[in-house]
Amino acid sequence: MKSIILFVLSLLLILEKQAAVMGQKGGSKGQLPSGSSQFPHGQKGQHYFGQKDQQHTKSKGSFSIQHTYHVDINDHDWTRKSQQYDLNALHKATKSKQHLGGSQQLLNYKQEGRDHDKSKGHFHMIVIHHKGGQAHHGTQNPSQDQGNSPSGKGLSSQCSNTEKRLWVHGLSKEQASASGAQKGRTQGGSQSSYVLQTEELVVNKQQRETKNSHQNKGHYQNVVDVREEHSSKLQTSLHPAHQDRLQHGPKDIFTTQDELLVYNKNQHQTKNLSQDQEHGRKAHKISYPSSRTEERQLHHGEKSVQKDVSKGSISIQTEEKIHGKSQNQVTIHSQDQEHGHKENKISYQSSSTEERHLNCGEKGIQKGVSKGSISIQTEEQIHGKSQNQVRIPSQAQEYGHKENKISYQSSSTEERRLNSGEKDVQKGVSKGSISIQTEEKIHGKSQNQVTIPSQDQEHGHKENKMSYQSSSTEERRLNYGGKSTQKDVSQSSISFQIEKLVEGKSQIQTPNPNQDQWSGQNAKGKSGQSADSKQDLLSHEQKGRYKQESSESHNIVITEHEVAQDDHLTQQYNEDRNPIST
């Protein structure tokens, strides 16, 4: 390294003397020619041929100067380094060292560039591209003592927005930078040259994030632009609630987003893991539209009003009113896989609503209305003595050819009034899929947990239209010493109704898997409804009355268990032949 540096310095001194001689000749004659200056010189029997080209750009006040030097020697062991240095400070010190033959040293930043042309033995030198606020055109004579030469103020490297580029005509380049606030690029200067680009950027830690608007009363409106490649924001906190929302815009771009939204003092924390995999040919339109309006009022002895109208996505809402002893966690894994050819339109619209109350009086209410999606309900740690976690995977797989239209639509309107001695009125109107409803009014120390996985599999060819429609009207009155009235009107559905009366300190867990499979060819119109699962956990002296009117309902299972002082687990699987295991 030292020998190379000494060689470069000696070469610079020789070129400086030659430049001084040419400057004196230029001063006597007026000015050198503007295109290029050629000067042959000799050293130790070797012939050097120097050529300088200047190139000006006209974009944004920037300019580029290209210096190309051809060294016609046969000794390939010689290397030439071009070192760039602060030319303004050097120009103030002495004017005779403004242009040191195109090889410039940058002692502040310690940048080195090495150029080798292994094909013909020619060494190609550097280009410094200064991108500043002013356009400096430089001079055509490098040895003029006037301060406006290319080595003057135009090539200052003290500015923070200075961008220096090395334009290399050869095959390789080495550039070492010891500064973290400088940009180095290498680009090809001509059309037939090789382009090597190296760029180092120091940014103030900016990340691409989605837009989330949060208000005090629980109004949420999430707008996600899916043109971003990947958006990830992770925050760790000890808040006991989890909530997430994943929405896709109506574009053919699929994005996986992992977000944790942490609120202050509201005990909301969101986490979602969703994977949408679509394999197919000529999928013309795949849309995920969604809209949501929520209004929630949660007080100790007051009512809770919740309205949810959504058209698509996977949406989980969790609300807790906790006196410091409960923990709630919801995790959704959803996979929608579509394998098919020539699928013209596939749309998924779903909504899911969960509302939870965990007070000292132990009231917990959960309702999920979803369409082609997943509703997960979990309540954990009542009075600090129990903990439950439910993970519900749901897979909707559609295999088919030439499926023209598959639509899932749902709408939900909910109004709830939850008091200690008052009634509970709940109305749900939904159009098609899984409806999970759970209400708890517990005066003791019990816990209820409902898990319903659902799988919808559709296998068919040339399925023109598949629609799922259902309607349900519910009215419930849950009082301390009163009765429970439930009315369910459904069409072509599978309805599960379970009522359990627990007086003591029991814990009940009831998973209800439901599988609906449709298969056929040329199915023009199919209508059906998934399960509406309702569970009421009452205390002491409560009566249950169910009225169900359905045209094609089947597979009704009622299971009652009463266990005191222990945790009881009931697993109920409802399939085609209804096997029950406890």
Swiss-Prot record:
Question: Which residue ranges are recorded for the region named Repeat-rich region?
Answer: 70-559
Location in the cell: Secreted
Q: What are its GO biological-process terms?
A: antibacterial humoral response; coagulation; negative regulation of flagellated sperm motility; positive regulation of serine-type endopeptidase activity; sperm capacitation
Which keywords does this chain's UniProt record carry? Glycoprotein, Repeat, Secreted, Signal
Any one GO MF annotation of this record = zinc ion binding
Q: Spell out the InterPro entries in the cross-references.
A: Semenogelin (IPR008836)
Q: How does it assemble?
A: Interacts with SERPINA5.
On tissue specificity, the annotation reads: Seminal vesicles, and to a much lesser extent, epididymis.
Q: Where is the composition biased (Polar residues)?
A: 31-40, 137-160, 174-194, 325-334, 372-397, 445-455, 482-496, 506-532
Where does the record say carbohydrate is attached? Answer: 272
Outline the segment boundaries, as ranges, of region: Disordered.
24-59, 132-160, 173-194, 228-248, 269-582
Q: Where are the sequence repeats?
A: 70-129, 141-200, 201-260, 501-559
Q: What is this protein called?
A: Semenogelin-2
> Which stretches of sequence are listed as region 4 X 60 AA tandem repeats, type I?
261-500
Q: Which organism is it from?
A: Homo sapiens
GO (cellular component) term, any one: nucleus
The region annotated as signal peptide is: 1-23
Q: What does this protein do?
A: Participates in the formation of a gel matrix (sperm coagulum) entrapping the accessory gland secretions and ejaculated spermatozoa.
* KW Secreted (keyword) present: yes
Q: State where composition is biased (Basic and acidic residues).
A: 292-310, 335-345, 413-426, 456-465, 533-552, 559-582
